[in-house]
C-alpha cells in the first residue's frame, strides 16, 4: 500500500474582486477565510487548481 503525498496551501490574499471561477476554485480547495490552511492530496488536479489561483495562495 502506498502513502499519498499531501500538500499544504494557505490563502494569503482575499478573493474579493477576482473572477467568479477563481473564487469557486478557492472554495474547492477548502479555503474559507484569509490565512486559512488546507492540506490536500498532491494530485495533478489539485496542482492545476493551485496554479490557477497562484496569486492568492502560498504553498507551505
Curated annotation (Swiss-Prot):
Keywords (A to Z) from UniProt: Ribonucleoprotein, Ribosomal protein
HAMAP family in the cross-refs: Ribosomal_uL30_B
Organism of this sequence: Acidovorax ebreus (strain TPSY)
Pfam families: Ribosomal_L30
Name of protein: Large ribosomal subunit protein uL30
Lineage of producing organism: Bacteria, Pseudomonadati, Pseudomonadota, Betaproteobacteria, Burkholderiales
GO molecular function: structural constituent of ribosome
Gene it is expressed from: rpmD
Similarity comment text for this entry: Belongs to the universal ribosomal protein uL30 family.
UniProt GO cellular component terms: cytosolic large ribosomal subunit
Amino acid at each position: 500500500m502506498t502513502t499519498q503525498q499531501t500538500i499544504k496551501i494557505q490563502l494569503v490574499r482575499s478573493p474579493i474582486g477576482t473572477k467568479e471561477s477563481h473564487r469557486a476554485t478557492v472554495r474547492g480547495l477548502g479555503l474559507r477565510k484569509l490565512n486559512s490552511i488546507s492540506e490536500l492530496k498532491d494530485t495533478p488536479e489539485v496542482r492545476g487548481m493551485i496554479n490557477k489561483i497562484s496569486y492568492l495562495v502560498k504553498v507551505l
